[in-house]
Amino acid sequence: MATDGASCEPDFARAPEDAAGAPAEAARKEFDVDTLSKSELRMLLSVMEGELEARDLVIEALRARRKEVFIQERYGRFNLNDPFLALQRDYEAGAGDKEKKPVCTNPLSILEAVMAHCRKMQERMSTQLAAAESRQKKLEMEKLQLQTLEQEHKTLAARLEEERVKNKHVVLMLVKECKQLSGKVIEEAQKVEEALAQLEEEKKRASGLEEELSGEKRRSAEMEAQMEKQLSEFDTEREQLRAKLSREEAHTTDLKGEIDKMKKMTEQLKRGNDSKPSLSLPRKAKDRRWVSVSVGTEGPGTGSVACQTDLGVESTDHVKKLPLTVPAKPAAGSPLVAASAKGSGGATAPLARPGVDRQASHADLIVSSPPTIPPPNTNKIEENGPSTSSGPDTPSSTAPLPSNAAPPAIQTPNAAAQNYPAQAPSTHTVHSPCANAALHPALTPRVQAVRFRFQGNANNDQDQNGNNTQSPPSRDVSPTSRDNLVAKQLARNTVTQALSRFTSPQAGAPPRPGAPPTGEGSTHPPVGRTSLKTPGAARVDRGNPPPIPPKKPGLSQTPSPPHPQLKVLLDSSRASNAGPKVDHKTVALPPTSVPQGNRVINEESLPKSSSPQLPPKPSIDLTVAPAGCAVSALATSQVGAWRAETPGLKPPACSDRPLVIPTTIAFRCPINPVSASSCRPGASDSLLVTASGWSPSLTPLLMSGGPAPLAGRPTLLQQAAAQGNVTLLSMLLNEEGLDINHSCEDGHSALYSAAKNGHTDCVRLLLNAEAQVNAADNDGFTPVCAAAAQGHVKCVELLVAYHANINHAAAEGQTPLYLACKNGNKECIKLLLEAGTDRSVKTRDGWTPVHAAVDTGSVDGLKLLLYHRAPACGDGLDTEASRLGVFDLDEGEANPESTPTPVIPADLINHANREGWTAAHIAASKGFKNCLKILCRHGGLEPERKDKCNRTVHDVATDDCKHLLENWNALKIPLRISVGETQGDNSGPDEFESEHTICALNIRKPTSWDDFSKAVSQALTSHFQAISSDGWWSLEDVTLNSPAEASIGLSATSVLSITLGNVPWSVGQSFTQSPWDFLRKHQAEQVTVLLSGPQEGCLSSVTYASMIPLPVLQNYLRLVEQYHTVIFHGPEGSLQDYIALQLALCMKHRQAAVGFSCDIVRADVDAGFSKEQLVDLFIKSACLIPAKQSPASKKTIIILENLERASLSELLGDFLAPLENRSPESPYTFHKGNGTSECYYFHENCFLVGTIAKACLQGPDLLVQQHFRWVQLRWDGEPMQGLLQRFLRRKVVNKFRGKLPSPGEPVCKMVDWALSVWRQLNSCLSHLGTPEALLGPKCFLSCPVVPGHAQATVKWMSKLWNAVIAPRVQDAILSRASVNRQPGLGQTAAKKHPSPGQQAVVKAALSILLHKAVLHGCPLPRAELDQSMADFKGGSFPLSLVSSYSSCSKKKGENGAWRKVSTSPRKKSGWFFSPTWSKPDLSDEGIKSKTISQPNCNRNASLSRQKCLENDLSLALNLDQRLSLGSDDEADLVKELQSMCSSKSESDISKIADTRDDLRRFDSSRNRPAPSATVTNPRMPVSQKEVSPLSSHQTMERSNRTLKTELGVSRVKSFLPVPRSKITQCSQNTKRSSSSSNTRQIEINNNSKDEIWNLRNNEQIEKPNQ
């Protein structure tokens, strides 16, 4: 069984079956199993099991042997490294025997698997080989670079050695110098030791001298103590003797007063005087108990004064409630009761002496008459003249009262107040006789002089009788002395009243009913505490003049030693935060300089007084006089507004400072105000003169300047000079023995007083009388000093003419120029400068006139000091140039070259006072920005100079001045962007500039390099966003208003390099010097930013030059590199050639950077460019390579420009397949002229770029389209859509030096108009179906940007229209209209010989385009636009083109194409005839007839004019002048023109009204010519100058109005061609109507609104409104 099994076939698959089947058959034949016993069966089973095991062993052995034989035979040639054997080995060892399956039963499949595996391995090895080759190339390149670096290293090492040698030499030199310096140091140390030894000796000597000096001081102190003791004893004895003397003098004075009083009363009774004496002596003695006197020696120098009317305790209460506190004078002057009110009408404040607080009752201080009301015609006797009774209509010598103010029944004393800021204001008690002298209109000079003499003697008597002005007030004031004073004053009042009676006119009127008598019951309302509000304001007092001061400090700031209290009062009066207050309410001060005719308005309402007798207070509205004009003390209480800190002179009453008007003024009646001519400086007539009724001819003789305070002048001459009384002064000057140069105790002469008060006539009289012109007072001030300080120009001019010393310096060093600058009077400054005064004189405090001018903030005075040249200087400024208005601050800053050269040197500008402050310190600390500007404009100013506290001008400056100083020293460097040198001059427009200014950088001293870097980056970012934004945003607003997608892709990273002048710099780089010092040292005039361009393989400079966004250019570059064949096409002027060239340059430099050479070949294609020339070009440029030749590594870029001139199918048709398959397998066979042919194929590295100036392809050229990559540059899409806007905006920024103007500027409007013209023009051409006439933005890039000259843009537009736009439109329309019209002649012949219909369509289209696209929206005014209309071609549409369709309706009415046009079922007839004018057919959309808003006469006239013109036109238009359109293309153009006019998306052409370019509707009736209301002479052609289109806004409004109003009034027919559908239906209506009517009107149908084509509205309706 084993043998049978072993002898079976070696097929292992069938072996088990055969081995099992053979023993089974033998067993069936030999024995039967069923017959076997159990043991046999067991034995048989064991035998079979053994056989099976042996068989399995044999099978496994055979399998192993077979495998080895197979492997050895089939795969013996493979080694152990074979991957298949490894696979088999791994497979056999990987799993068990039972799990193993044969890899493949078929050896072929095993072989195929091995081969596939081998292929994969081969591919992998090839890739690894290629990678190894690339690595080898890189390694070689790195070796080359390493060699170059080694060479550089060698050169650097050599340089380093040279530098080491140089440094070694330098070190040796430094060592030598150090040795020399060390020797010098040793010598200097020895000298220092010697100096120290000498210093010790000097110190010892100084200590000995100090000991001796201390001993001397002790001895002198002892002697002073002894002298003080003796002086105190002498003072005690002197006071006792003085008290005794005063008592005796008072007693004597009382007796004399009683005697004089009795004498005068006797004389009055003898003369028949009806009036009673004012007050008897017993009454005076009876009322003496109400006088309370308190004497204080150490109290403050203020006096509390009050007025009262009733006698009793209640009056005393009023005195306590209503005090008037004023600073007291240093000493007393006039008597207490020397000046009573007029007729006892008002109580005046008594004199308040230093240390005396006195409250006087009305009875003791005022002499009053019995309390009886006088009869109506009785005149009241007053001290200095009569006063008419109160009445509203009675003339009086008071200031004008406004009509709305009730005249109060009170009067103030007639004296002008005078204030002395250098000392405390005085209490006004003394009635000035000079002041009241001018109140009498009929007063003769002789009587006036007598009155002055009498009152002057009375004042002298007062001074002689116990009121010595030079002595201090007595400590022992007895009642007897006061009684004597009262008696003496009563006597003097009686005499004055008696004298006034004979010198006064008789006038009277009954008093106002209900008002208390002025003479007895009325009192002044109490005046509250007054204080200074501003430095230029003084204290407000009553109307009385001050008492005579004992010792005025004159022009000095420091008081005299005998009066120690004055210094305290002086300091208290200098408060700068106080103001004049009247009745506890501040009065607003007018400006410091009151011009002629100004009105000073006082407060309307003031607090009412607690006194029951006071009437309501009126609001005063006075016309006050300017400088030099005195104002009556009845009307005003003048206070000079001298600054508190002003050294020296005290202002007079007639100062040019503001006048403070008290409200407690008594007015008798209103008078006429003073004219402005009577209030000029130095004029003789004044407000008082005019008010008093003097004759103008007497004014110069009687008075000059008005009343002024006497100010304590002891002589009549000084009084007359101070008062300005020319008559009295001339009388006194004629007397013999009078000393005209006599000066009072303070050194003031008559000339000084007249000059100080501004009395020019008095000054002239005194100078003619040979008064001393340079006489100085105790403080060293001369008359010219006083006049200059007060601003009296005429007086200064007179004094200078009489050779006054204009350079005289006072005790403190003040010159007239200094005082004029301190006052801020520019006229005086100019006059003194022209006289040649010295500008460099300094005061004791080190102040110069420049300091004074700056301290007061006088800009004009400072300009004069710095720039005004004296006439003697030769080349000084002329009169006009030196005027203050010429040198303006802003103008000087904008035009530095126009600034005049300063006259004063830098030393004077930088001069420091005692505290170390320069004029710039003062201006900066006070915030006078304009003064600081003028000082900074001086080239020699040193703002870094420090004062004694080590502070600079910037340290003490206010915020505004600090900002000014920082910006003034800042360097304004322009920042410019450069795009580098552009290659290919013919590729881009000429408007592509290489540099553009974007802004100006302000570089200050503290600016760091980090700040500078941030400023440059921010400026670039802001500029890029500004030019790419949609609106005219400012550079500060672009970050907020500019959207992110509007950016053109440029940023700070697009910068290649930055140069500061000529020095290269990069952002973030720092130098040792600050940017301010660095730029000044290198004289950098600009900062230039260079953008990376094609030379660097970037397109940033191309983006900035062309304004095409950077992402778009990068996308174009990607297309060229990817597809190798790209064509750029778009309308003419879309920058196709420029884009292609810049992309080629960028690719060339990119390839050069990698190491490959690249050439650019440009070819300009024209109509004669043949395919053979193109082949030669390809072969020469190595783009076409012979089939047997291997390609080179060089790359080539071919640019074919202007492909639209040739046929693409003919030129490139044979190259399409080779261009797509660039290999030797797809060659191109080129047949030469000699019959030979060669095969070529295109190089893989050849790039073909073409440009076509055509919007779309047509005809056979479409076959070429699918073989190229096309880039369309549409005018209504990016990048062309926003290119023009961005380009023009950048042009405006460059023109305005980096600043964007506001949207309302004319430049912005003209730029927006040019942009809209380009867009509207292309939109209209698109509607016309003429894409070949579309324009790119290139020709609009030359739009001029001329600020202030909008006409230049219109002229440029007219030239562009005539040279470019109009010819293109004409050619496009003719070419379209002649396609089917003249097929035999072609388009060229049709353009040369157009038919009349074509001419009509062309001119109609030009007129429509001109009005709709160009003139529409022009920002020029109507008049200028009318003048510019004649420059545009095609603006006038001639009348000879008007005709009708019916002339050829029979011949061409059956045209099939035209019939197609006329059979539109959606449109109905829009025209039929109406027999009348008054029944318009209104549309369903609500168009209503509106009446014309003008008179009926104008409407009737226009209607009649229209009818006449229509009749004339019907006679003028003959059949020969009509034409018809017979071409279908022409009709289609007409329809497109009509649809364009009625397009709602565009501006409606029907709204372009009032033009003479009529586009006429072709009427359907031959016998009814179309009338036109706009033709003035139908037999003459319409000239182009008559064309007058409106602006867009006016056009829309006017057209909307006339479109609705004409429907019912007048009908203007449109004469443009209409479709055939209208002609047919209109002709049917014509047959039904009479053909002989020439005045029929056409109405609009309800359903024909869209068919209206009226290019212009009726003009005569609007003409009456013009």
Swiss-Prot record:
Compositional bias (Low complexity) spans? 385-398, 457-468, 1627-1641
In this entry, which stretches build a coiled coil? Answer: 120-274
List of residues that carry Phosphoserine: S1527
Q: Which residues carry this modification: Asymmetric dimethylarginine?
A: R501
Each ANK repeat, start to end: 712-742, 746-775, 779-808, 812-841, 845-874, 915-945
Query: According to the UniProt record, where is the region Disordered?
Result: 1-25, 202-224, 366-411, 457-481, 501-619, 1545-1601, 1620-1666
Q: Which GO terms describe its cellular component?
A: actin cytoskeleton; cell cortex; dendritic spine; FAR/SIN/STRIPAK complex
What molecular function does GO assign, one term? Answer: protein phosphatase 2A binding
The record ties this protein, via PROSITE patterns, to: ANK_REP_REGION, ANK_REPEAT
Q: Which domain of life is it from?
A: Eukaryota
Stretches of Basic and acidic residues bias are at 1545-1566, 1648-1666
Q: Where in the cell is it found?
A: Cytoplasm, Cell cortex; Cell projection, Dendritic spine
Q: Does the keyword Lyase apply?
A: no
Q: What is its main location?
A: cytoplasm
For this protein, the record's InterPro entries field holds: Ankyrin_rpt, Ankyrin_rpt-contain_sf, Cortactin-Actin_Reg, Cortactin-binding_p2_N
Q: Which Pfam families match?
A: AAA_lid_NAV1, Ank, Ank_2, CortBP2
Positions with biased composition (Polar residues): 469-481, 1585-1594
Keyword annotations for this protein, in alphabetical order, are: ANK repeat, Cell projection, Coiled coil, Cytoplasm, Methylation, Phosphoprotein, Repeat, Synapse
Describe the task this protein carries out. Answer: Regulates the dendritic spine distribution of CTTN/cortactin in hippocampal neurons, and thus controls dendritic spinogenesis and dendritic spine maintenance. Associates with the striatin-interacting phosphatase and kinase (STRIPAK) core complex to regulate dendritic spine distribution of the STRIPAK complex in hippocampal neurons.
Q: How does it assemble?
A: Interacts with CTTN/cortactin SH3 domain. Interacts with STRN, STRN4/zinedin and MOB4/phocein; this interactions mediate the association with the STRIPAK core complex and may regulate dendritic spine distribution of the STRIPAK complex in hippocampal neurons. Activation of glutamate receptors weakens the interaction with STRN and STRN4.
Q: What is this protein called?
A: Cortactin-binding protein 2
The record's gene field reads CTTNBP2
